[in-house]
Structure formats: structure tokens, C-alpha cells
Amino acid sequence: MELNEQYIEQHILSALKEDVGEGDYSSLACIPSTERGKAKLVAKQACVVCGMDIACKVFELTDKDIVFTPLMKDGQNAEKGDVLFRVEGSAASILTAERTALNYMQRLSGIASTTAEYVNLIKGTSTRLLDTRKTTPCMRLLEKYAVKTGGGINHRIGLYDMIMLKDNHIDFAGGIENAIDKTLHYLKENHLELKIEIEVRDLDELRRVLAHGGVNRIMLDNFSVEDTRKAVELIAQRYETESSGGITAENILSYARCGVDYISVGALTHHIKSIDLSLLTDE
């Protein structure tokens, strides 16, 4: 995923407006406008770096005269104590931009690092790791960028780029067959070319989908490892397969060994810890 420059700029401007408001009175009150300073961002724990260009843009939009020097790139592994970037310029401006820049980098690096951990757990299998739509409001593109930076694959971005027939869709539509037929009719009538994924809750629902057809991918929702193995055998590579629900770091390899094409993990974006990064004055 490539982040649009205009999107990033507007996102950062909103974040700065939220934080700075009418002014950074703490800095304005005690630091002369002529005071210059240097600072460095230090990793206080190992991580996968993510958000470097965004941090650079935060400082640029705060004060175009700040000199930002990146020392690592997104996707690189940082060790505890590594310096990720240096900045030089107005001391007050550096302090004004500090928290917004760190908020982006700490969260995005946390997502990238968590994703990398999960990807490493299923290394050696053919299964690929997907994210979900369980993202922070207005942060989805950034968080999905972080997932990709960590080695994961982006699932659909929103409700508009893929059909996902979940349990509630099926129930409201009057069953699996009705949901599929209505969807196929809608896509044809509106000249839309979208892939269809359908969620099944047990092996009986899976058999109904297999008998009916008309989809591209089948999501095995909250299946046990044993039932996942049976499901993969029943599907026999006729459709893409995805395991979802209840997948953790402890059991993800067991699911991957069942032979599913994808495993989606909501925790990549909604249950992560931000990375501990600290901006320190530099000599």
C-alpha cells in the first residue's frame, strides 16, 4: 500500500490542530523564538520501524526550517538504543511537533512489529497473514500501511472494494443461497467487478456454500483446528480459504498447517502496544 501525500498532509494537519490548538503555550512561555536546538529519537525497545516519512512531515508542517535527518527506513529492525532520526531547528518548534510525531511513529511501529511477529510464526507455510477492518477511526490507511510494512497483507480497505457476506448479512438475506444469489444479481445489474467472500460458521454451512457456488473465498469463522483441517479437505482448492476468529500467537501455526490460504487477525490493529520511543535533546 502506498500512502497518498495529500492524504498524509491533511491527516497530520488535523492531528496538529487537535494538539496545538491556539498555540503551544508551554514552549512559547519559556523558550525564546531565537533559541535553536537539536534532538534525536531513541528506540527504548526493539521494533520494526514505521512512520518515518510521516514524522518528517509533522516537523515540516510545524516549521519548514527544521532539518530532519532519518537514520533508518520503514521496515527496518531497530534495536534498543538505536537512534531513528535527528532534528535540528527552532527549539520551540521541535517541542511543538514532538508529541504528534511520536504518536504516529509509536503506534505504527507497534502495529508493524506485532505483524512481523505473527508473520514470523507462520514462516515456512504457504499461509499469508491478513489484517481486518478493526482499525482506529480515521487511521485505517495508516494502520494498514503499518501492517504491510511488518510483512502482512491488506484485506479489503473498506466496504467498497470487496463483498464480504458475514453471518448477519446471511441471516437478514434469508440464508446462504439467497445471500449469494442476491449479491451476484446486484453486481451484474450494477456492472461491478468485486470478489465475493462468504463467512461460514460450521461444516454444515460450508457444505451448503460448496453445493451452491458463486463465491471466490470462504472464511472459516471460529473453527477449531480439527474442523479447519476437515474444511480445507472439503474445499479441495476450489475456493480461496481464510481462517478468522480466535487466532492468537499461540495457535496461529496450527491453523496455518491446516493449509488455509489466509489467516486474518484483528489484533494486528486493535490489540497492540505502542512502541516505547523517546525524543531526547542532542548534543
Q: Could you describe each region identified by the protein language model?
A:
Residues A267-E283:
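Short, charged, intrinsically disordered terminal tails
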Residues D221-N222, G245, A267-L268:
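Short secondary-structure boundary segments
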Residues E2-H212, R217, E226-L234, Y239-E242, ...:
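Acidic/glycine-rich phosphate/pyrophosphate-binding loops and surrounding catalytic core
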